[in-house]
Amino acid sequence: MPVWERSSTARVVPPARPRKLAKVPFVELADGRLQGVVSSGSDAGRVYVSSIATATYAFACSTNNNRPCGGARGTFCNHIRALVGEAVLQYGAERVARYLKADTPDGEPDAPRLVSVMTAARPEQGDTSAAAPVFSRFLRHLAYLELEPTTAPLPEMQWFPPTRTVA
């Protein structure tokens, strides 16, 4: 384990399996939702912000400029299904199922079973108000990827309390 990781207060969790970032470049389990950014299948310049709420499975899918997804009418669209699939790759099926409170009674959870359990509950279409903050975090994530590797602290992270000196 690298020194910077040992001295960190938050552990870096490696992905359950490697995944390609072209279709779903951003996935997170946060704010009581599985949420992320999903690329459009038809337009390279368009992305969708999709989310599923914990326990209720209320879902939302809209473009980054808040236009509703045409496929998310009464059930999960392909963007949400892709989001679940990539979340399972990123975090592992057990962790995603536990976070969403989706019990798969017929064995080991995987992406199709999770989608099946959630759609069987007939979830309602949720609020799309979270799309802007999720997209903003995605853009911030992209900005961090463009930075040169360094051990110097990032200015916007200075509000974290120091735990100990870095070796």
Residue map of PLM features:
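Long, low-complexity, compositionally biased intrinsically disordered regions
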Residues: 1-167
